[in-house]
Every structure is written in C-alpha cells, then in structure tokens.
A protein has these predicted regions:
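Core catalytic lobe of class I
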Residues: 1-138
Length: 138
C-alpha cells in the first residue's frame, strides 16, 4: 500500500516541502476574489492574479510532467459587469508554462435566486484543467 501524507498549513509554505515533479494530481479551490473576507482576509480582483501566481509557480514545479492540475474558480460581478480576473489568470499561467487543456462546468443544482433585479445567480462554477505537457494523465 502507498504511503499518504497530509500537509496542513499555508499552501505556499507546504508546497516548498514537496520534491520537483512528485505529484500526479492537484485539485484546489482557492478563495475567490473578494469572497470570504472574514475567513481568508479576502483578495481583491485587482490583486488576485498577483496573489495566485506564486502558488501556481510552485504547483507547476511539483506536478509530474504527465500530471494534471484542476482549478475551481469563479468570476465576480463588480459594478454591473463580470470581472476578467479569471481570464487574466489563465493568460498569466500560460506565460508561466502551463497549458490550459480543458474546462469543465460544475452545475450547482442547489443554487437559489439572487437578490438582483436584473441578473440571474450563476448555477455553475469553472473547473479549469492545466497540464505541463500535451501528453498527460487524468
């Protein structure tokens, strides 16, 4: 049987404990921009990409060449329009060396109506798949 190790703590600090090219699958759902401020302190949409890039750099380092990284993330509506921070993050991660290979939709059937008179509440979230190479395992 394989050994399983669980690390608890700040992901950026704990990732530094892992060897290069040692992880097969990474699935994460970091705090979305401007969400859960009381729990996580909140990261603004303007700062989100800058905040996440050091994490994605470490994830790229520890992921095996055939590994897969799944990022659960969601846009935020600000001042009547959707923020582009998720799209900006994808572009910056590509500059780091990530391949954006797939996108899945998580259909949230428990979504309830929003409080806005001119907008429906999203009943979905993105699951973005990134890989190091075009030949990868799922």
């Amino acid at each position: 049987m394989s050994k399983i190790t669980i690390y608890q703590g700040d992901c950026l600090q704990k990732l530094k404990l892992l060897e290069d090219n040692s992880v097969d699958l990474i699935v994460t759902s970091p705090p979305y921009a401007d969400q859960r401020k009381s729990t996580y302190g909140g990261v603004s949409t303007k700062e989100y990409v800058k905040w996440f890039l050091p994490i994605s750099k470490e994830l790229l380092r520890v992921l095996k060449p055939t590994g897969t990284f799944i990022l659960n993330i969601k846009e935020k509506v600000q001042n009547g329009e959707r923020s582009t921070y998720v799209l900006e993050l994808i572009l910056e991660m590509r500059k780091q060396g990530w391949l954006w290979t797939e996108e899945f939709i998580w259909h949230k059937k428990n979504s309830y109506p929003g409080k806005w008179p001119n907008r429906f509440r999203d009943a979905w979230e993105r699951l973005l798949q990134f890989n190091k190479n075009k030949k990868f395992n799922m």
